[in-house]
């Protein structure tokens, strides 16, 4: 395949054009008065969104060189979204500002590598300044404020996220789903839930709700299949003597074993229920261990030299209550020791840090959350499917921003933290003229997000920038929603430190690569010689088909 190569200024101009197209489409969504972007879908109604990364992901340009520039900026949005979960539009605006200024400097004959060094020095200084201004999130109200800002001022969403986090803890699983109704609601499942239901409807104790409810049950955890209850008879007799219900969790319970349990349950001799163990393979083993730690029991495993015949009551787990539907099992208030659970949580956290697979990380985080305290589901409602999808985007953003705020703290919002960091960057002095130019590029780029937020609100950006920079108050800034100056933290206009920091670092990283690009290579467009050229003689070769016998 032939390639097309572009060099120097021509390459950078093409790339900058791609950066501008993508950034201009994304940046209209920034701030409380940002506009929507409508995206055509191959089927169904168009999608309306104010989420920067969703807009960025949809953009593919026809010109391959312009498209390379756009794809690099898309990479910034995706990276920021993966790391901090929000701040994608801010990162895109910063990238565009840095690349524009950088391209001008390179065109003026400056050394791109020195410019990049200057950019890196300035970004380090800006990040230190932002981190210094950061303050920890203490109250539930502050959590709600962060959520509200990220959800574009919808306080209902902010309050719901704060409530979910207070119920399941900061480590807990909070998932976002589309509701079937108009209302947005919060559903909290306390305790540990896994997606396996009862193996037989004969175990049901509450026929109205079609659920199995066991109070103060003993829990038998077995890692293999159970086909016969013969080896279990000693422990079953001990359970009957204790008068407590029994929950059996095993890889599977088949044939005679299941039939015997059902018969005993129906005769009233033994209050029992059985479910399959969650997960597959090694993950199943790990989840059984989690259940053992949570319930204060032991996994009955031949690897550990424990046989079913030798199981005693003190090897069984215990819980306050177990509820089983046809799809889920929930164990509430397991009897595991607090220090054992904490040790297990610490172990899973270490595994999360060590793993490189996103899928493994997600599964480990699910396990961590289940151990740490529960699952909350925010069901997002709306009048139409398009509205539900648009709101769900915003709830996802708000949830990610809130987690980031709890992790690293908060700074004044509305682009103010970045603007204030430009003061610290402005104090940097380098002897090398080109490195100094790189520092100045960042100093000017740090103004871009607040300018864009203000301009989206229909106000002149440079006036606001000047007024905020002149102020001596720590949290002074511009409220674009009300179009007035105020103490941003007091007004609840705050951004997570992690989001602001990540947006700047990711933007500078990709922009540095774009500025130092000197050549671009893409597939050359195919030359179209006309379709008929490949078949001379008007398909004469098919003349012999006349004698074919059909």
Curated annotation (Swiss-Prot):
Cellular compartments annotated: Cytoplasm
CDD domains named among the record's database cross-references: GroEL
GO terms for MF: ATP binding; ATP-dependent protein folding chaperone; isomerase activity; unfolded protein binding
Gene3D superfamilies in the cross-refs: GroEL, GroEL-like equatorial domain, TCP-1-like chaperonin intermediate domain
One GO term describing the cellular component: cytoplasm
Enzyme class (EC, first level): isomerase
Keyword match Nucleotide-binding: yes
Superkingdom of this protein's organism: Bacteria
Any Gene Ontology biological process: protein refolding
Database matches in PROSITE patterns: CHAPERONINS_CPN60
Keyword Acyltransferase set for record: no
EC number(s) from the headed UniProt entry: 5.6.1.7
NCBIfam families per UniProt: GroEL, PRK00013.1, PRK12849.1, PRK12850.1, PRK12851.1
Family the entry assigns: Belongs to the chaperonin (HSP60) family.
Complex formation: Forms a cylinder of 14 subunits composed of two heptameric rings stacked back-to-back. Interacts with the co-chaperonin GroES.
Name the UniProt record assigns to this protein: Chaperonin GroEL
UniProt organism field: Parvibaculum lavamentivorans (strain DS-1 / DSM 13023 / NCIMB 13966)
